[in-house]
């Protein structure tokens, strides 16, 4: 059976990457694509590497233009997808929202951090957080999936085994994350302008990044109690990839490197796309580029009684 797929917001970096993945999928066929800036023109007019390979004409971003689809991906900025998602689900479509509109379960939290108009706030408590390593069975049965953010994916997967074990002092988690420039999207800003980001490493939105409540929401669910994190993102001069270095104080007094390695190997034993490394083979962004892998290495520091976790993903895929 071929799944007929639509993409709303196809002109961005995420939309382009989605085309690559779907065109190489044996059971998927892209039948509709839309944007606000390229209506009436072929997708290849923006993603020029697709010239002669995929020349589907982009349609207006209206729900009825996706009537033929079984699944619709929304690759839209925050505030732009909730209304369209509501219409599509009412038409019986499965919707996967790659943006931020459906990730937070609490409407007030969404308004505090995003401040954008939300056209379907009543659905937020029921939207499934689309991290298959944690919510696989729910994802299978739901029509609305909230795709996780890029920073949160690297951090949540990096910490999940420890929080499930109760090995972490919950008030001690510090997340230092570095992202390639595509994580900022296609809209040009001073920070992403080539002369400014090339040969430059910069911190931004320290203690104020919008992914913070998403990280805290999912880590709190894993820990079974509310927690806060210190999240410190940085922009690095490369196109794609995220590396998160997460440090925390251990709650377990007799922890060893062997116990740490075993806990991660056990937790991710059946996960095809999580690869557990070790402190002698720390993961790098180049190792996961273009892939769906998350590579993780936990490290025990007996001198400071701290746990350090290195987690890497490709922000345009995983």
Please describe what each predicted stretch is:
Residues 23-27, 164-168, 209, 217-224, ...:
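Generic secondary-structure signature for well-ordered alpha-helical cores
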Residues 54, 127, 227, 292-294:
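Short beta-strand or tight-loop elements
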Residues 154-155, 182-186, 238-242, 255-257:
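Short acidic/glycine-rich loop or secondary-structure boundary segments that cap or lie
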Residues 30, 170-174, 226-230, 273-278:
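A short coil-to-beta-strand element that immediately follows conserved catalytic motifs
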Residues 19, 156-160, 212-216, 261, ...:
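Predominant activation on well-ordered alpha-helical scaffold segments within soluble catalytic domains
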Residues 208-239, 243-245:
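Oxyanion-binding "anion nests"
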Residues 244-318:
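C-terminal active-site/capping subdomain that shapes the small-molecule cofactor and substrate pocket
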Residues 1-199, 204-206, 287, 299-303:
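N-terminal Rossmann-like NAD(P) cofactor-binding subdomain of oxidoreductases
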């Amino acid at each position: 059976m071929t799944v007929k797929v639509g993409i709303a917001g196809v002109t961005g970096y995420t939309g382009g990457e989605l085309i690559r993945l779907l065109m190489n999928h044996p059971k998927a066929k892209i039948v509709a694509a839309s944007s606000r800036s390229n209506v009436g023109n072929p997708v290849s007019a923006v993603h020029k590497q697709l010239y002669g390979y995929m020349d589907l004409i982009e349609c207006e971003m209206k729900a009825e233009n996706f009537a033929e689809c079984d699944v619709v991906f929304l690759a839209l900025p925050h505030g732009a997808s909730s209304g369209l998602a509501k219409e599509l689900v009412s038409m019986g479509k499965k919707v996967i929202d790659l943006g931020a509109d459906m990730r937070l379960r609490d409407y007030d939290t969404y308004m505090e951090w995003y401040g954008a108009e939300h056209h379907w706030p009543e659905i937020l408590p029921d939207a499934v957080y689309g991290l298959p390593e944690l919510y696989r069975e729910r994802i299978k049965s739901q029509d609305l999936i909230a795709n996780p953010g890029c920073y949160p994916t690297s951090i949540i997967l990096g910490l999940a085994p420890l929080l499930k074990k109760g090995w972490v002092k919950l008030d001690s988690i510090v997340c230092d994350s570095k992202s390639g420039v595509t994580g900022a999207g296609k809209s040009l800003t001073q920070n992403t302008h080539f002369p400014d980001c090339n040969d430059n490493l910069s911190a931004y939105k320290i203690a104020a990044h919008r992914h913070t409540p998403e990280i805290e929401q999912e880590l709190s669910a894993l820990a079974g109690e509310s927690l806060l994190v210190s999240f410190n993102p940085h922009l690095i001069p490369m196109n794609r990839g995220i590396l998160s270095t997460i440090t925390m104080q251990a709650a377990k007094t007799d922890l060893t490197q062997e116990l740490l390695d075993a806990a991660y190997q056990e937790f991710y034993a059946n996960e095809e796309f999580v690869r557990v490394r070790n402190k002698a083979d720390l993961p790098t962004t180049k190792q996961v580029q273009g892939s769906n892998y998350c590579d993780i290495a936990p490290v025990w520091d007996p001198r400071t009684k701290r746990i350090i976790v290195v987690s890497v993903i490709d922000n345009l895929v995983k």
